[in-house]
């Protein structure tokens, strides 16, 4: 049950040098000139996250190679050095991205980019432009192993292609799918259909999953950061806990793995005008930057993919504008950039589902107009409510801001093994996407952090029980059910008459049987004290969001909402509600509810739950009523979940920490209380239906059959 998202290395797309008969000029998609030119395809090559990017001096024949796992690191380095030496004989047939001058390809290997980072192949860092070792160094080499020679010869034979236009042999990267999996260079993610099988709800066993070291995945998740603490101490790691990041002030930045985007932010000639989005680059490379920053690279990181009318795939590169879009075959993308292709399939399937629902709505519009004597075709009615989002030719178009938000926020999710997120608008008018700082983990204020450390819930289980005798309850969900301490911990911390302990089923779903939405509730997750692994069904929040989600513009009345980009079963985790964890300000007026007496008069109800007067604040009723999570400025896509009088999900307080030594910070998760279909909006109830709040003049627009008409007043 460990997450499969984010475990694969990033796929990168490579620009190939043009043949002499081609124009060789990079053009934007959807232009008339491009249809007339014979633009050659670009091949994709999967490399590690620190792979080669535009601006690096790297020959095409030196691109990603595969080595058998039994090769020791020393021999791997020596083999790579021998390949560089032998590659000089194949210089004229090397397919490297060139600057086209006078319509003739030219390969410049003498120039070394100042901004080129080191390349990473097989996990070893190699400076770009590494020269041949001295004879003294060569003399220290052990005799060549025949096994390595066979690998080199096999790679060379596979890398020869006789299909180039000038009749010369062309060197291609000798990377097969099976070798990529063995060497770890391109670890394909499990397709969404096999990860979340509707029949079992659990991860399916696939060939790619079998190749992944389970222990490595467990160790990776165990080392993932659990929070960011804002302390005056300054940046660094919190003493004695490497999973806590400490900063003096929190600022959203471009993901550390997006090297090309960070390089473009420094040197790109194109800049976005208007508002800046936190953590999203404002500058990119464009056509005019090819000669200086893109001419000598063989591998470009692919950011997104789109289907073209010709059945090809349009690749949108990280750090570059849409003016450098290129078409590739589906087979090439599937072979070398499966992650991008998989995300494209998820997005396209979501858009098609939403379009089908819009078509049904358009039919009702046509019928209504016919009753009034107005002739309206189905296509005309559909265009009034749905415009399919497709790539635009101008980098200034708001469409590309949506793509940047989708990509960079997904990259933040990948670092934690979480599923991708998408930002999509099919509204008939251009709508600027939301502006906020994205974070996949909570940002904890120092005062709230100190309060959590002093809380009774933060005590280890041994300290909590003391000398008291406790009887373990045989948990049906925990892997180590006879020694699970979660239910016993709940009994020591909370009163079961006031708080409902939502238990999990053996398949990891929360049991919402006899659930009442207005009851205080909590989910107790396992820690290392229970003796179970991270696969345990009672650790769903620790594994995080495993279903792709989409922030979708619902229209001017509701604004942005969240929709499911895959089927979600009742009881499954949707996502966590993240943001700034702070103390409830004493100066802020706390909403006091009112009820109506038998005479129809209103009176204050002091027993009603306290409400913070903010639509982005999540308060706690069980764990700590003095702490809130505010997603007004910083958070994840859960901040866009809209209200419904008949919700499909619910906020649940979660007691969760991987290790007893980790500080216990109250967390909030979103769980589905009913099956949510692909394309369906995810909603929660902002107001308890069992309490009759003072009515306001604000109309509720949830459009459910249980709608209460108007929203409560505070």
From Swiss-Prot:
Subcellular location per the Swiss-Prot or TrEMBL entry: Nucleus; Chromosome; Nucleus lamina
Entry superkingdom: Eukaryota
Biased composition (Polar residues): 1-12, 88-97
Region (Disordered) location: 1-214, 586-611
Keywords in alphabetical order: Chromosome, Metal-binding, Methyltransferase, Nucleus, S-adenosyl-L-methionine, Transferase, Zinc
Enzyme Commission number, as recorded: 2.1.1.-, 2.1.1.366
Biased composition (Basic and acidic residues): 200-214
Location, primary (coarse class): nucleus
Gene Ontology process terms (BP): methylation; negative regulation of gene expression, epigenetic
Gene3D superfamilies according to UniProt: SET domain
Pfam family, one: SET
Record's comment describing the protein's domains: The SET domain is not required for localization to nuclear foci.
Entries under PANTHER family matching the protein: HISTONE-LYSINE N-METHYLTRANSFERASE SET-23 (PTHR46223:SF3), HISTONE-LYSINE N-METHYLTRANSFERASE SUV39H (PTHR46223)
Protein name: Histone-lysine N-methyltransferase set-25
Organism: Caenorhabditis elegans
